[in-house]
Amino acid sequence: MKMTSKKMKDELMKRLSRPEWDFQYDSEKEVLRIEQKDSKKGINVSLPGVVAKWEVNKEKAIEEVAYYVQEALIAMHKEENSAAKILPVIRSTSFPKQAEEGNPFIMTDHTAETRIYYALDSNKTYRLIDERLLQKLGLTEQQVREMALFNARSLGYEFKQDTVAGNTFYFLNTNDGYDATRILNESLLQSMREKISGDMVVAVPHQDVLIIADIVNEIGYDIIAQMTMKFFAEGHVPITSLSFVYEDGDFEPIFILAKNRKKTDGKEKG
């Protein structure tokens, strides 16, 4: 049998066929590229060189090249995952629960309006973790949750502050994609609770902002309602237009319209 570059290409593709890898063949240069689908990192194999080795070593030459390519791609994948961080992200409860049919995201309930998803972030790529990715990572759901919360606590924070009608509003807006994620940092919330004299109200209208407010009067509730609605409408990834009273580790949604209506009804009865 005469071995050609095309036959060698077919032989290598057969041996290196994996769902997470892609092949690209340059017939002019006689080069076969094998790369990871998600990162696009890969290996170029010059086929004439492999054919020349095959003329001497036959089957052993193909086995050696296939082994080299496989080990190199696996090493690249491990390096990429070791550099990646798992972080939690906050999403609306209306956000899709599946990446596609039969492949649900890894999720945790948070509040009546929000849910926690988990992202694999390697700085260059950002992907929500679903069951298939979880299997590739070789992690359990519990391990993902623990790693994500640990990494969330390492996120820095510096608030801007504004006071209106006696109410103080603190804004976090670093635009790192994880501003809303800081709502999961219990030590951050507790430190803010200690400096707040009135009701502690927290809002995550979209993923790139966290608002914490010290509300001391009804005007403050009206302001936080309008503010949250405005941010929600402008956000690239909106989460919820409702804000929450934070007390003893729990988030209670504030239904402003119902609150104001109740107040008005009380005046009319008086």
UniProtKB/Swiss-Prot annotation:
It holds the Pfam family DUF1444. InterPro entries: DUF1444. It comes from the Bacteria. Belongs to the UPF0354 family. This is UPF0354 protein BCQ_4506.
